[in-house]
Structures are given as C-alpha cells and as structure tokens.
Regions:
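ATP/NTP phosphate-donor binding region
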Residues: 1-87
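Non-catalytic interfacial helical region
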Residues: 77-91, 98-115
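Generic secondary-structure signature for well-ordered alpha-helical cores
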Residues: 82, 148-151, 157-164, 172-184, ...
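Short glycine/serine/threonine-rich phosphate/pyrophosphate-binding segments
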Residues: 95-101, 123, 239
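A glycine/threonine-rich phosphate-anchoring loop and its flanking beta-alpha core
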Residues: 102-194
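C-terminal charged capping/lid subdomain of soluble metabolic enzymes
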Residues: 174, 274-344
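Active-site segments that bind and position negatively charged phosphate/pyrophosphate groups
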Residues: 192-301
Length: 344
C-alpha cells in the first residue's frame, strides 16, 4: 500500500494547490455532506483552481454511511463524466472520508483522492491510514478496502466551529493514541483544558496524535500485526455503536470508543495486569466527559453477538487489543463469554 502524505497545514489553500498539482487529472470533484457544504465549502470555493470542480453532496451523519449513499456517489461521478484520471476531494468528517475514499477506490477500479478532514475524529483517525468503507447489515465498516488518499490535509481552523460533542468524539481517539504510545502524551491529554480550548496547543497535540497513527500504519499497513494496537476500545466500542443503531438511538463513534476503552482497560487489568491507578484515572476522565452508555444485563447477549462479528476475530473467538502498561501493547488477546460479560 502506498504511503500517503499527511500535512498539518499552515495555509490550506497553498497545501491544497500543491496536492492537486501532484495528482494530474482531467476532472475535479468535491464530495461534501450537508453540513460541510454549508460551513466549510464556501471558504474553498473562492480558490481559483477549484472553480470548475463538480460538487457532490450527501446526507450528514453516520446513518448515511450506506451502500445506497455510496451508489449515489458512483452515479454522480458517472453522470458527470468522471474517468479513471479524475480526482475526488473529500471535504468532511469521518463518514465523508470513509465513504468518499471507498467510492474513489472502487470507481473504475480506482481514482485518486484527497482528504480534507473537518472534524477532530477525521483528522486524527478516519482520514489517515487508508481504511475506507461503509456500514452494512447493521455492522460498522463491514464493507471496505485499504486505499490510502494521495494526500491528507489537516486544517485545524475547522475545529473552531466544532460543537462540544464532536470535539469529544475525536478526542477519544486521541486518548487512545496516548494510551498506546507513551505516558507523556497520555498525561497531556488528561490535563488539557477542554472547557477553554487553546487551539494553538490543540494543533500541536493533533500533530502528535496523527504521528502515533502514521508510525504504526507505516509498519503494518494491512493490519496483520501491530496496527491492531489502533483497535484499543473498538471491540466493545463497535458493539455499543451497533446496539445503539439497532435501537434507533445512534451515538457518535468517539463516544462508543471511549466507553469501549473503559471496558477494555478493565479487561487489560484482569488479563495482563494494566495498573489500577492508570485505569481509574482514565475511566474517571471518560465518565466526566462522556457519561455512560445505557444498557443492562438483558442486552449482554446482543452485545456479545455484535462482538462475534468483529473483523479482528479469528477461529470463532472475540479478539481484543489490551495494554500491560501505557505503550505496552498486547494484540490478539481473547476472552471467553463469561469474562466479556464481567467486563461489560
């Protein structure tokens, strides 16, 4: 898998101009959702080299991350004359970069694309690393491919218009990166004043968080080994997310991951000895900022069934990423049903 270029922008217009120059193309398309079309696209439409770009807009939120939406993007590309040499720019959050990346990867067997993430979650996670896809049959990211963007352009000025819930959704992935990397990054994430955001310092933290993911992806682009470290919190988290969708009470991805981290740090303590004090500090931070996911023991079987569908599983066992210590990662860990119920 080719290595994508990730740029923490000083000037989005300059960085985008250079990224487009590196991708020779016959036609340019911009994919947005209803929110980014209104809030983010106007600042780019003034750029001269985008004046002829064809706009494609899809519904916002994860409920639109579907085969039907994907087909509508394919249809728009086809009807507007896209060829194998066209270029797609994805301007949006994780849903847009995931679905747009998959549309680009599959249209005419693959066209070039650029990601411009507009949410914190997309900046530190979804747009980086080459994973693309859609939800299917009630399961998160069930259909997709590894297809890295040619460039990922991170403009943290977009974060100034982000609401608190979407800020914390992305921050959960940053917290995960702190846990799997080093104590210093973990501490700065717990100590950061989320009530009075210093955006200059946040930009630096975003850079460090992205670097954690980039370093891991470069070692293991297709998730056969160490890249599974990035799944901390996601086995339980995806189960919470799928249950919430099934019950028509969708939750933001990062909130599900945060609740998944609570479960999987407890499992880490049980199985591999993750320190109780660091587990409690992290869980306290999550409880204060994310609350808790409402479910009861009657739903354990359903949550367990969702975990059994997780893509990381092998030979019928539920696979977890656990921690012995901050930065000391244990991949390919399993737990039996009783232990998983105790974790929940």
């Amino acid at each position: 898998m080719s290595k994508q270029e990730v740029i923490l922008c000083e000037s989005l217009e300059t960085s985008l101009g250079r990224a487009i120059e590196r991708c020779p193309h016959d036609k340019l398309f911009i994919l947005t959702d209803e929110h980014t079309q209104r809030l983010c696209l106007p600042s780019l439409k003034e750029v001269s080299f985008l004046k002829d770009a064809v706009e494609i807009c899809i519904g916002a939120e994860d409920v639109h991350k579907t085969l039907e939406t994907l087909a509508s993007v394919w249809m728009a590309l086809s009807q507007q004359g896209a060829t194998r040499h066209s270029l797609l720019i994805n301007l949006g959050g994780g849903m847009v970069t995931d679905l747009g990346g998959f549309a680009a990867a599959t249209f005419k067997r693959g066209i070039s694309y650029i990601n411009i993430p507009t949410t914190l979650l997309a900046m530190v996670d979804a747009s980086v690393g080459g994973k693309t896809g859609i939800n299917f049959n009630g399961l998160k990211n069930e259909i997709g491919s590894f297809a890295p963007a040619d460039s990922v352009l991170i403009e943290t000025e977009f974060l100034r218009s982000l609401d608190a819930q979407n800020f914390f959704s992305g921050y959960a992935e940053m917290l995960k990166h702190g846990l799997i990397s080093n104590t210093a990054h973990w501490v700065e994430l717990l100590d950061f004043n989320t009530n009075n955001i210093d955006y200059a310092y946040l930009k630096n933290m975003v850079g460090r968080s992205v670097q954690v993911k980039e370093d891991i992806v470069e070692q293991d682009p297709f998730e056969r080994g160490i890249r599974k470290a990035l799944n901390l919190g996601h086995t339980a988290g995806h189960a919470f997310e799928s249950l919430a969708l099934a019950e028509n009470r969708p939750v933001l991805h990062g909130y599900a991951v945060a609740w998944g981290i609570v479960c999987e740090l407890y499992l880490s303590h049980l199985k591999v000895g993750f320190p109780k004090d660091k587990m409690r500090q992290t869980i306290q931070f999550i409880k204060e900022n994310y609350g808790s996911f409402a479910f009861d023991c009657k739903q354990y079987e359903q949550l367990y069934a969702f975990m059994q569908h997780d893509k990381k599983n092998t030979s019928g066992t539920v696979n977890f990423t656990l921690l012995k210590e901050i930065g000391d990662i244990c991949i390919n860990q399993t737990a039996d049903k009783d232990t998983i119920f105790e974790m929940l």
